[in-house]
Amino acid sequence: MLTVKDIRQHFKDALAREDFVIDKSGVKTIEMVGASFLANEDAIFGDVNWDYVRREIAWYDSMSKKVADIPGGAPKVWQAVASSKGEINSNYGWAIYSSENHKQYWSVMLELLANPNSRRAVMIYTRPTMHSDYNRDGMSDFMCTNAVQYMIRNNDLHAVVQMRSNDVVFGYKNDRAWQHEVMGRLLDDLNSKGDNRYGMGTLTWQVGSLHVYERHFDLIAQ
């Protein structure tokens, strides 16, 4: 399977070839369609802003959909996509923990405790109504993560993240940090609540459109 190193080289090669895709706003992008790789590094390009990651995870844990509740203030990107009420869809903590979305984290944990070999341990982030939910009240937030499947194989917990869209510069770093955090929490819960003891397995990243925007081409060229 491809690794982050391979993905990094793919984008460098595509930039050298000037293999561009023009997005809906007329901006050049480099895109990899149907990407699948081991998310074995924290970042593909650039460095992780761990201070922001911690604040975003705290906001996810709050399950609030209001961007004003992000500790330290909401980044401009969240403000730009929020509704007229300051709300978004993509609070990932709400997606997996909230009773409004069927407490999926707990369903997955209980499934794996009852059947460690299960293929049904899936946390579903998006929903069919996203086609109309994404732009309600002036919002522009079509959730990027589709689902995450968890499997126990060879006594290790593995996760497969399935996304419709992911920016290789900022999106990947923050999303990977969240998914690694959730995977660690699930592992701890399985080990503390069940009779078996598992290790941390692989984190696989699958993306319909893995892309980088023109404004970040300089990071690729480095």
Residue ranges and their predicted role:
Residues M1-Q222:
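Terminal, non-catalytic protein-protein interaction segments that mediate quaternary/complex assembly
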